[in-house]
């Protein structure tokens, strides 16, 4: 335990909290070529690679991911949620934060139903999370 004299000389420091999605905290001023710290909920980017990845130990699957070059100049790995997708190289996508626990290095999700990403076909429940429109049969109500 520190004495009062020690605390007067050198006060306690606050712990610096590290961001779980650092690419969303950075902004790039292209006119002045300066990086500023301004956080945003989403970022736009261009797919540089689309592929599949195998998850960590107890799980087994082929999870779809995309390497995305963001507007702030950073390149990140983003998960493509839902069944089936239309993404390919040079597709423009919107990413949000949120990691995939069993894929190392994947800290972001691609938002379905925006920009070049289509929504999930034949999705009935939790449609807004997958960018799916309301089915025609339900619209009569």
UniProtKB/Swiss-Prot annotation:
GO MF: rRNA binding; structural constituent of ribosome; tRNA binding
GO cellular component, one term: small ribosomal subunit
Keyword Iron: no
Record keyword Nucleus present: no
Stretches the record annotates as Disordered: 118-141
Pfam families noted in UniProt: Ribosom_S12_S23 (PF00164)
Keywords from the named record: Ribonucleoprotein, Ribosomal protein, RNA-binding, rRNA-binding, tRNA-binding
GO BP field: translation
Assembly behavior: Part of the 30S ribosomal subunit. Contacts proteins S8 and S17. May interact with IF1 in the 30S initiation complex.
Role of this protein: With S4 and S5 plays an important role in translational accuracy. Interacts with and stabilizes bases of the 16S rRNA that are involved in tRNA selection in the A site and with the mRNA backbone. Located at the interface of the 30S and 50S subunits, it traverses the body of the 30S subunit contacting proteins on the other side and probably holding the rRNA structure together. The combined cluster of proteins S8, S12 and S17 appears to hold together the shoulder and platform of the 30S subunit.
HAMAP family assigned to the protein according to its UniProt record, in alphabetical order: Ribosomal_uS12_B
Family to which this protein belongs: Belongs to the universal ribosomal protein uS12 family.
Name of the protein: Small ribosomal subunit protein uS12
Organism: Mycoplasmoides gallisepticum (strain R(low / passage 15 / clone 2))
